[in-house]
Amino acid sequence: MKIFREVFELGNKEIILETGGMARQADGSVTVSCGNNVVLVTTVVKKSVADGTDFFPLSVHYLEKTYAAGKIPGGFLRREGRPSEEQILISRLIDRSIRPSFPDGFFNEIQIVATVLSYDGAFSPDILALIGASASLAISGAPYDDVVAGVRVGYTNGKYILNPNKQDLRDSDLDLVVSGTYDAILMVESEANSLPESVMLGGILYAHKHLKTIINSINRLAKVASKPRIEYSIYQINKFLKSQIKSQFFGEIKNTYTIALKQERNLKLNAIRKNVLEYIFSSDVDGNEYTEKEILEAFHDIEKDLVRSNILEGKPRIDGRCTETIRPINVKIGVLPGVHGSALFTRGETQALVVTTLGSDRDAQLVESLDGIEKCRYMLHYNFPPYSVGECGMVGMAPKRREIGHANLAKRATQAVFPNEEAYPYVVRVVSEILESNGSSSMATVCGSSLSMMDAGVPIAEPVAGIAMGLIKDGAKYAVLSDILGDEDHLGDMDFKVAGTRYGVTALQMDIKIKGISREILEQALEQARVGRLHILGIMNEVIKEHKEAVSDVAPQIHVMNINPAKIKDVVGRGGATVKGIVEKTGAQIDTSDSGEVKVFAKDKKSMDMAVAMIEEIVAEVEEGQVYKGKIVKLLDSGVFVNLLGSQDGYLPFSEIEQAGMKTNSLVEGQGLEVLVQNIDRGGRVKLSLVAR
């Protein structure tokens, strides 16, 4: 058993790549170590293409084992279940990073599994998994010539931080992951605190500069440990078939791509496809028998060439816009009467209905990870039903990876403006229902989420808007597109989503289908996105530009009280009897903490006010010189104890009672008396006198 090892430094941390010791029956197997973090990444490549496959079946699975952190899983079975959303997001991040590096037309199945074996809690293992995926591919024999690497970058006090740990990220204004090849950037994922475009671009370029160290190390490992290149074929469009279809139908196709409405355009294209199939099947084109799949792929290639060439030649886009024009936008808020906050955001043929719901601490999501259980106060969910694109399909199933990814992007885009718990004690759930989709539904979700939260009275720091940018590139010629359609995303070379406030960027997500893009294109895309974002924010601000001062009449009420910590036991009562009594009488939820914080959460203002008043009565402090109406709670030989407020009693001597002209032998427990607080000693003992009638 021969083991090969490569060591390099990343942000003053030593990273070790090792192969030959584990999972040797996989085509590629690499362990990546940094400190006490160890990730095993395996690659298996099928040696032939499955029948009927017309796409690249790459799958990436990132898995965290609880034993890696010295823990036993919860639940009845005490074993790991389905991957968490965070694991799915990391799987997507790796997939998006490496997918562009494979040759077009390569359809062999590849499965990559990254397993976290050891975890020290200081660094997230996601970058190690990404590096390991690239390294295991590089030695697997797959056609993976443009080796990819990825790094994370933070930004604190005006300086970029390479490979920041979790504490660094808590203090950072930026969480940026960049992956790419030696010469080009392929993928960007980031969350930021409204940073200028120049800082975002600088972070991307800073990250790319440091990718080269990792790529060199992977290449050295591959040089000594790589398996022989597998034999594979590349699927190619039949050029003669394509020319025959083009000669007969190009005029119709060209005219159809001037129809702005998607549904109308698709109906016409489907009719042309039907005619194309009939033409090819009924005529002896070149003596070959073509399958329906081959014919439709040739047809699709003609569509792709047409749309791309039109844009590069400066002609109008599919819906008649120029490269920088944004589709018509319509904004409505308060569209649903029975919810806490709602917005309907429509941009062209993309429409998102976004609803905000307010809840208490008990509604917070508990997220279990290797770091333990974390309470999530802000949830954002994205639903993409089949009717949004005019199709039939599965409804009511668990969210797909794409839905999870889009929700995460929208949440990251709005996280920077979301209030902290001290400023806003509510738990917030935002749900985006995509009612129509023709591109940029995730960015419509960003805009709708901002609007919906403001409608619900959530005090977000600034409105947030998002825009999706596209790219058409052929050699040195290129065009950057603002607010792309679904077809432009599908037929183009880039999907670059940018979200932010009027002050700067809060989130970026970029995916590339070609071999990378230049600094010049990045700069233009960011500037064009900034102009577009400000345009969208201007339209949103005409409807609502800051949060409503009060929550909806149908929204729950919440009140936070800070009392003397010593009084918490009085609010709770023996065995919880006091607080249970308040809950039963008012219907409110009451949460207490040892710090003295009391949260009252009620379905309406009346219930909340009643609960708050009862708690205030319990915790109120008696004051010297004040008169109180109390009740006798205990008779002694020399006087009586009178309950004044809550659990606070005072001592009333018989001498004071007699001085006021009242007989002491007539006193009974439960009798009401009006008393004056004479003094309170250092021990908190209260001395009373009787108020004369």
UniProtKB/Swiss-Prot annotation:
EC number: 2.7.7.8
Residue ranges constituting the KH domain according to the UniProt record: 556-615
Chemical reaction(s) catalysed: RNA(n+1) + phosphate = RNA(n) + a ribonucleoside 5'-diphosphate
Gene3D superfamilies given in the database record: GHMP Kinase, N-terminal domain (3.30.230.70), K Homology domain, type 1 (3.30.1370.10), Nucleic acid-binding proteins (2.40.50.140)
Biological processes annotated in GO: mRNA catabolic process; RNA processing
UniProt GO MF annotations: 3'-5'-RNA exonuclease activity; magnesium ion binding; polyribonucleotide nucleotidyltransferase activity; RNA binding
GO cellular component, one term: cytosol
Top-rank EC class of the record's enzyme: transferase
Cofactor annotation: Mg(2+)
Keyword Cytoplasm annotated: yes
Chain residues that bind Mg(2+): 489, 495
Compartments, record wording: Cytoplasm
Signal peptide as annotated in the record: none
InterPro entries the UniProt entry points to: ExoRNase_PH_dom1 (IPR001247), ExoRNase_PH_dom2 (IPR015847), ExoRNase_PH_dom2_sf (IPR036345), KH_dom (IPR004087), KH_dom_type_1 (IPR004088), KH_dom_type_1_sf (IPR036612), NA-bd_OB-fold (IPR012340), PNPase (IPR012162)
Domain annotation S1 motif: ranges: 625-693
Alphabetical UniProt keywords: Cytoplasm, Magnesium, Metal-binding, Nucleotidyltransferase, RNA-binding, Transferase
SUPFAM superfamilies registered for this protein in UniProt: Eukaryotic type KH-domain (KH-domain type I), Nucleic acid-binding proteins, Polynucleotide phosphorylase/guanosine pentaphosphate synthase (PNPase/GPSI), domain 3, Ribonuclease PH domain 2-like, Ribosomal protein S5 domain 2-like
Function: Involved in mRNA degradation. Catalyzes the phosphorolysis of single-stranded polyribonucleotides processively in the 3'- to 5'-direction.
Assembly mode: Component of the RNA degradosome, which is a multiprotein complex involved in RNA processing and mRNA degradation.
Family stated for the protein in its record: Belongs to the polyribonucleotide nucleotidyltransferase family.
Protein name, per record: Polyribonucleotide nucleotidyltransferase
